[in-house]
């Protein structure tokens, strides 16, 4: 019996343990709100000092009753329409509070907790909200213009048409958030997480999204023109109708995406992981962004990524286009290096880069880097005419039964053409006479053999495609 009595006393002592002392700052705030008689709180430039104050739903609910400072419908502190700009809310707990249309511009609210709060049309412009928690908030049209939101959490928040232009969002977490129509123009959002978020029709133009994570997010008709998506993760993202014009997708993960309805004009792809990603070369325009900006070495890497992707989806013609552009970027880069070496009076560099430029330029003219049959036909025609002219100049082609050289254009062209396409000098009643003429015949025959082999290689490429 004594043991039971002792146990009951212990339980009673635990249940009657006093709550933490009520913060007098909180009491003063509640009294001030009640004195407004239903009107929004106006501080007239006098900021609140509520650092580490507990204004949470759980703390105030036992005291609320029908108090004027309590939002009975939402079960939280009622600060709707409050003018509390510049207030100190660092580490304050405002979970469940009603802050609809409240003005908190310039507030200091680092590590504050706004979870489950109503912040529709609230103004947090230029506020310091680093590490703050906005988990599950309802915040349509909330304004975070130029706010500091580093490492802030907006998980599962409803922030349709929210404004976050030029805000600092490094490390922020928007996983599962509804951000339909939100504006992030010019924001800095390195390492920000948007996993599974709804970002339809969002404005992310000129936003820094380096290392951002969009895995599984919906970006239908999103505007990402000029955004920096270096090393961003977009696996499983939905990008129907998105505008990626001029976007920097260098080293981004773009595996098995459907970009066929996206605008990709002058986008950058150097080092991007593209595999099974569906889009057409025409969507990029005449050149990738690196080439437009004169960054030929990076453009070469960009076209390589495109070439490999087009191969992976079986689009061989477009893979050939990307290959040719890649080779051309190599030539242009060699030209830039040649000019730099010339300016620096680097003879070795001049010879090395000059030779590379000339070799690439010749191969481009000859067969467009192994992709053009028409250019090979042109090379054949040019060489036939050139050698026919040389044969005429040397006067070394003598018709059989005649001691005089022929200068007939038909004789010269027919002999030159047959000599280009046969292994031995043609037997058409004309004999080459003289050392120079025989040397020309040999050189032309060897050149013809090389061109015929190249013709077979290019033809094989075309047949495979």
Task: Give the residues covered by each predicted segment.
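Tandem repeat scaffolds
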Residues: 2-323, 330
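Cytoplasmic (intracellular) domains, linkers, and terminal tails of multi-pass ion channels
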Residues: 220, 260, 265, 270, ...
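Generic recognition of stable, solvent-exposed alpha-helical segments in well-folded globular domains
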Residues: 301-305, 314, 321, 357, ...
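Short, charge-rich amphipathic alpha-helical segments embedded
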Residues: 321-348
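Transmembrane alpha-helical segments and their cytosolic interface motifs
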Residues: 344-394
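Pore-loop/selectivity-filter region of tetrameric P-loop cation channels
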Residues: 363-370, 396-450, 454
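Juxtamembrane "helix exit" motif at the C-terminal ends of alpha-helical transmembrane segments
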Residues: 383-406, 460-462
């Amino acid at each position: 019996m004594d043991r039971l009595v002792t146990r009951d006393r212990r339980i009673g002592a635990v249940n009657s343990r006093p709550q933490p002392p009520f913060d007098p700052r909180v009491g003063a705030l509640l009294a001030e709100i009640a004195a407004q008689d239903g009107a929004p709180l106006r501080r007239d430039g006098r900021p609140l000092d509520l650092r580490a104050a507990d204004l949470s739903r759980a703390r105030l609910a036992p005291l609320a009753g029908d108090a004027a400072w309590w939002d009975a419908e939402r079960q939280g502190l009622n600060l709707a329409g409050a003018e509390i700009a510049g207030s100190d809310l660092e580490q304050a707990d405002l979970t469940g509070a009603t802050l609809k249309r409240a003005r908190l511009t310039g507030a200091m609210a680092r590590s504050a907790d706004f979870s489950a709060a109503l912040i529709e049309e609230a103004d947090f412009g230029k506020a310091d909200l680093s590490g703050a928690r906005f988990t599950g908030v309802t915040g349509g049209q909330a304004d975070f213009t130029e706010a500091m939101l580093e490492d802030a959490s907006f998980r599962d928040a409803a922030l349709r048409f929210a404004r976050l232009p030029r805000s600092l969002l490094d490390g922020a977490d928007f996983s599962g958030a509804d951000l339909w129509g939100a504006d992030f123009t010019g924001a800095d959002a390195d390492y920000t997480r948007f996993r599974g978020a709804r970002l339809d029709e969002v404005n992310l133009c000129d936003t820094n999204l380096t290392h951002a994570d969009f895995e599984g997010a919906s970006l239908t008709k999103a505007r990402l023109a000029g955004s920096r998506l270096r090393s961003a993760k977009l696996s499983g993202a939905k990008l129907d109708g998105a505008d990626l014009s001029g976007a920097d997708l260098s080293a981004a993960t773009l595996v098995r995406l459907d970009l066929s309805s996206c605008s990709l004009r002058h986008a950058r792809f150097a080092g991007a992981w593209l595999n099974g990603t569906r889009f057409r070369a025409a969507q990029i325009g005449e050149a990738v962004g690196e080439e437009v900006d004169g960054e030929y070495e990076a453009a070469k890497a960009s076209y390589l990524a495109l070439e490999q992707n087009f191969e992976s989806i079986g689009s061989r013609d477009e893979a050939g286009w990307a290959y040719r552009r890649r080779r051309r970027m190599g030539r242009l880069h060699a030209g830039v290096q040649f000019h730099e070496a010339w300016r620096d009076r680097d003879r070795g560099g001049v010879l090395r880069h000059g030779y590379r430029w000339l070799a690439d330029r010749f191969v481009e003219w000859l067969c467009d880097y192994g992709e053009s049959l028409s250019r090979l036909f042109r090379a054949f025609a040019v060489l036939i005419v050139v050698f026919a002219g040389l044969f005429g100049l040397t006067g070394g082609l003598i018709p059989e039964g005649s001691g005089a050289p022929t200068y007939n254009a038909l004789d010269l062209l027919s002999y030159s053409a047959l000599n280009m396409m046969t292994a031995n000098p043609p037997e058409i009643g004309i004999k080459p006479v003289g050392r120079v003429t025989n040397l020309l015949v040999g050189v032309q025959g060897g050149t013809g053999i090389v061109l015929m082999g190249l013709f077979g290689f290019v033809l094989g490429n075309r047949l495979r495609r």
